[in-house]
Design a protein with these regions (language model features):
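Alpha-helical scaffold domains
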Residues: 1-119
Length: 119
């Protein structure tokens, strides 16, 4: 998995925006794999993507965040909270609000609370 993460990190490099969708989609099966439990590198890779929040990747980001939340709700909510705190852009909050209706119910309510506090 560590070599795979290196490859995905290259796909998700800011200079390779055309590869971002592929990189995000590649992470979902890794996260849901029972053998994988190292989420911090995933959050590190995803940070710049969530800060940019391109509209074209909304569904990919939504799927990835839902998978992360299923694996570790606390870590995922903390990651989102820290991302919102560390950016001056409104794009992440706007994108997250757009995603809300399609997220699992418990994730929706917890994310609403984070959005209320941080925006």
């Amino acid at each position: 998995p560590s070599l795979f993460l290196v490859l995905v990190k290259e796909w998700l490099h800011p200079a390779r925006k055309k590869m971002w969708s592929n990189g995000i989609q590649a992470l979902v099966p890794l996260i849901t794999s029972p053998e994988f439990d190292n989420l911090p590198p995933i959050f590190e890779i995803l940070g710049p993507i969530l800060k940019a929040s391109p509209a074209a990747l909304q569904f990919d980001i939504q799927e990835l965040l839902a998978a992360l939340y299923k694996e570790s709700s606390d870590e995922t909510l903390y990651f989102i909270q820290q991302t919102l705190k560390s950016t001056k852009s409104e794009l992440p909050a706007i994108a997250l609000r757009r995603m809300l209706p399609d997220l699992p119910q418990d994730f929706q309510s917890n994310l609403r609370e984070v959005l209320r506090k941080e925006t």
